[in-house]
From Swiss-Prot:
This is Uroporphyrinogen decarboxylase. It comes from the Bacteria. It is found in: Cytoplasm. Pfam families: URO-D. The gene is hemE. It comes from Oceanobacillus iheyensis (strain DSM 14371 / CIP 107618 / JCM 11309 / KCTC 3954 / HTE831). Disulfide bonds: none annotated. The keyword Cytoplasm applies.
């Protein structure tokens, strides 16, 4: 049974008018919080994410400490991959490293199928614990998108130019679309289970898809994303898409069956609207600005809020994730600024 007392963000995601602009921050849970760093001295990342009590604690901390209007599940986008046969290791200072990278169709055909109930019960238990007992604001579930996940699986880890990924996509389209189908099946099952456990909105992170041009996106990715979001629509929860450096793809996203488009810091709300974006937009303060002086933070935040309130249909967020060097006190002050300033308008 849900114990939500503040559903402002859901109303905003649905395009309804709200009393103020709701706010949350990508990567709000975790590295920037002293409580989390203290926890990491006792437990590994694996232990935190696999113990519902610990994971729920980390997930809800930003709501308690900053006053955000939503929590986002504390997990990594790589979390479901081991259950379809991907040998992934999160290496400190590097990121995800794949020990069995995809090289051909045979590698794709070896991938299995995820069963969230038996494979990731700790994820679902965390969601239920939060939504039934602990959170009075909505919980956002999430998944990585096929292109972004595939880029790690093909490159073998993080990449600057995604040359191996693009080469396989161009050279072996049959292999590419077979991989897209496998990942789409996994994402749909994984997200289905999150919503059924209690998640009230879903964000799909397509972090690196901006490396594709618009034509390649239309051919190799858009049909895949259309299928995923179309199938997830049956849950009647808000669906959000987000990527970095993807200004040239905004109108492609506007065609997708999503409710919300996340903007990174490079494209203003006004620019997105001038391009023709009609969906609810989420964003988009540059995280680096939060390392500046308060006068600059306040000025830039109000500018974003003014544009959001002028055009309507806006949820405040950063243009990328919270970095470890951002002070928790700054995030609390920022949340208060967003709420108070937008209430006065």
């Amino acid at each position: 049974m849900s114990i939500i007392k503040n559903d402002t963000i859901i109303k905003a995601y649905q395009g309804e008018e709200t009393d103020y602009t709701p706010a949350w921050f990508m990567r709000q849970a975790g590295r920037s919080q002293p409580e989390y760093r203290a926890l990491k001295e006792k437990y590994s990342l694996f232990e935190i994410t696999h113990q519902p009590e610990l994971c729920a604690y980390v997930t809800r901390l930003p709501v308690e400490n900053y006053g955000t209007d939503a929590a986002i599940l504390y997990k990594d986008i790589m979390s479901p991959l081991p259950y379809i046969g991907v040998d992934v290791e999160i290496k400190s200072g590097i990121g995800p490293v794949i020990h069995n990278p995809i090289r051909n169709l045979q590698d794709v055909e070896k991938l299995g199928v995820i069963n969230p109930v038996s494979d990731v019960p700790y994820v679902l238990d965390t969601i239920r614990l939060l939504t039934e007992e602990q959170l009075e604001v909505p919980l956002i579930g999430f998944s990585g998108a096929p292109f972004t996940l595939a880029s790690y699986m093909i490159e073998g880890g993080p990449s600057k130019n995604y040359s191996k990924t693009k080469a396989l996509m161009y050279r072996e389209p049959e292999t590419w679309f077979a991989l897209m189908d496998k990942l789409s099946d996994m994402i749909i099952s994984y997200v289905d289970a999150q919503v059924e456990a209690g998640a009230k909105a879903i964000q799909i992170f397509d972090s690196w898809v901006g490396s594709l041009n618009a034509e390649d996106y239309r051919v190799f990715i858009k049909p895949v994303m259309t299928r995923i979001f179309s199938e997830l629509r049956r849950h009647e929860v808000p669906l959000i898409t987000f990527g970095v450096g993807a200004r040239h793809l905004l109108m492609e996203w506007n065609d997708l069956p999503v409710d919300v488009i996340g903007l990174d810091w490079r494209t203003s709300i006004n620019e997105a609207r001038e391009m023709g974006v009609t969906k609810v937009v989420q964003g988009n303060l540059d995280p680096a600005i939060l390392l500046s002086d308060w006068q600059t933070i306040e000025q830039r935040t109000k500018q974003i809020l003014d544009q959001g309130m002028q055009s309507g249909k806006h949820v405040f967020n950063l243009g990328h994730g919270v970095t470890p060097d951002i002070e928790p006190a700054t995030l609390k002050k920022l949340t208060e600024l967003v709420h108070n300033y937008s209430k006065q308008k």
